[in-house]
Amino acid sequence: LHNAKDKMALAQTVRPGEIRLETFPEAHCAVVEAPDFAHAKFEEAVYLLHVRQLITWARENGSPSQAPGDIICRESLERGDFMEDYYYCLVPPGTTGWPLRVRPAGTYAVLYHQGSYASEYGACRRLRDWVLEQGYAIDGDLYEEDLVNDIASEDPQSYLLKLSLKIQTP
């Protein structure tokens, strides 16, 4: 509940559509691989099961983040593929019993995107293109975090997503 309040407070201070640079500390992420939605409805069921498992695990193990986010790997971004590669929840350092990825400390280009999940892919493309237009190098993965989602709002157009892309500044 505390994490949800922090996210709602942050959501009230940002301007949707704005891209800015932010510095983040290292963070540990428990992950599940995202299924390939293009091939079968069965994969959607597997995705829902994985997300449910991830949320349940996070609650039982004291994760500071209850809502799973998405990770789009750098290699996918470079190919122009904006579908998520992993789903994640933040976990404390030293967590075991789950596949982990580390979000490196450093500078991130951050886009606060307001809109449905279906519009997220275009927003990821916009963020990647902005980074390249500014002369920055992509230096890592893109992380999606829900600030306002279907739990907080029934209107998908009011969802607020935080998209963070690791960059290298000149």
Predicted regions and their residues:
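A solvent-exposed interaction/effector surface
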Residues: 1-170
